[in-house]
Each structure stands twice: as structure tokens, then as C-alpha cells.
Amino acid sequence: AHRITEECTYCAACEPECPVNAISAGDEIYIVDESVCTDCEGYYDEPACVAVCPVDCIIKV
């Protein structure tokens, strides 16, 4: 699974990229539901959210 860190700028680039809808808007940053996140396995070669994040604030946990 992945997690969005405090460096998130709330740009929303990641949310529509998630094939399993694991990303949602939190109060100040976007949140990954780690119980839903599949690391895009079976969908993409790499996590889609990581690929589009302009500030590289999404980390593997």
C-alpha cells in the first residue's frame, strides 16, 4: 500500500488515477485507504498515483 505524506499540496492529481478508488480528499491532504490500495498490481506497471504526483509525496508503506 501507499501513503500520502504531509508534503501533499492538495492538487488532486492522484485521486482520479487510482483504479481502486483508494484515494480521497482529507481535511488538508489526500488520503490513501491502505486497506484498499493494491499498489496498482494488475492495473499498471507502477503505482499510478506515484507517477502523477508533482511533489513526490506518495510513499510505499
From Swiss-Prot:
Pfam families: Fer4
UniProt domain 4Fe-4S ferredoxin-type: residue ranges: 2-27, 28-61
Coiled-coil regions listed in the entry: none
Keywords: 4Fe-4S, Electron transport, Iron, Iron-sulfur, Metal-binding, Repeat, Transport
Binding site for [4Fe-4S] cluster 2: C18, C37, C40, C49
One annotated GO molecular function: metal ion binding
Superkingdom: Bacteria
Protein name: Ferredoxin-2
Source organism: Chlorobium limicola
Lineage, top ranks: Bacteria, Pseudomonadati, Chlorobiota, Chlorobiia, Chlorobiales
